[in-house]
Amino acid sequence: MPATAVQWHIERHKRILARHPEVRALQGTYRPSQAFIVVLVAADVALAWAVRHTTWWTVLALSLCVGAFVAHALGVFIHEATHNLVAHGSRANKLWMLVANLPLLAPAAIEFRVQHLLHHKFLGEVDGRDTQAPSRAEIAFVGASPLRKVASFSLGRFFYRARPANHVPRDGFLVLNWCVQAIATAALVWLVGGKGICFLAVSALLAFGPHPLGARRLSEHFTMRADQPTVSYYGPLNRVSFDVGYHVEHHDFPAIAWPRLRALRNIAGDEYRDLFVFHSWTRLLLAHFFDRRYRVEHYIGFGAILEPSPSGPCPTLKTPGPTGRQGGAVSPNGGNASGMRPPSFV
């Protein structure tokens, strides 16, 4: 394996372009994403307005079953704009990020942009440079305790902000994000009331926390194989998540927008066929919470590698690939080299 996780993706990028030069045509912005952002923002606000006179149970149920999906999709488009894939130029993309941020209440878009680009640059460099890597204090605190794992994952944003690498210096767009969001949140309080705001807040917390969609954060760089720092998800929730599960593909080619990631995998299938993949965010989330083998330090860079049994939540791991390596090689039918297909709930 290359010396760093970043180098692993760089080498794959070069190799894929050498073997499949047509992949270059997939790179570039996808401007229809702008329409998706407008529709999703309008839908989120409309739902918040619709629940203002319903029961609290209805508010919570809709947050879980509908709102979380809308909020998560908006987060996906903030991610797309972070890579300048929604419009031409960084300034236009930052403005679209502010729009997508509106129903999420917390002014997180510009801060995320800075942190996420550093994550790509320093992937797997723990102790301060990879902005998604947990701190050692966080690892020591959480340990294998199911209760602490649930708490840390549910309050992930607060842990995230406490990580040294995630300090974001102030600039004009960061301040603009705060100001625009403060005005938007005040307007939303007036428009949709307490229950509507609760709907928006709970939806956002679930989308990036204790919900099958939130398990995306776990799956992306969970070290299931020593030679693979990034993992994709090929389950059904990609359909409502704008293919954000195609994460190896994304790190290989950050300049390819979401609707073209499947095409990348189809063209360069030889480079993706033998990688470990997840098929169920739900199953991963439950395993992380309640299986004591799953720990925070299974993030790439800490050297901890999970090896569940064949009957466990990730039964592809222990099967030998066609080259004799450990690691659940994925066959063309979506199973693994032994013919065992992972469970694919959601």
Feature annotation, model-predicted:
Residues 23-27, 53-54, 86-90, 231-233:
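Helix-boundary and loop/linker segments of multi-pass membrane transporters
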Residues 68-78, 108-110, 158, 201-226, ...:
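Transmembrane alpha-helical segments that form the membrane-embedded catalytic/substrate-channel core
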Residues 74-83, 112-124, 217-223, 240-256, ...:
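Histidine-centered catalytic micro-motifs
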Residues 94-102, 229-241:
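Membrane-cytosol interface motif
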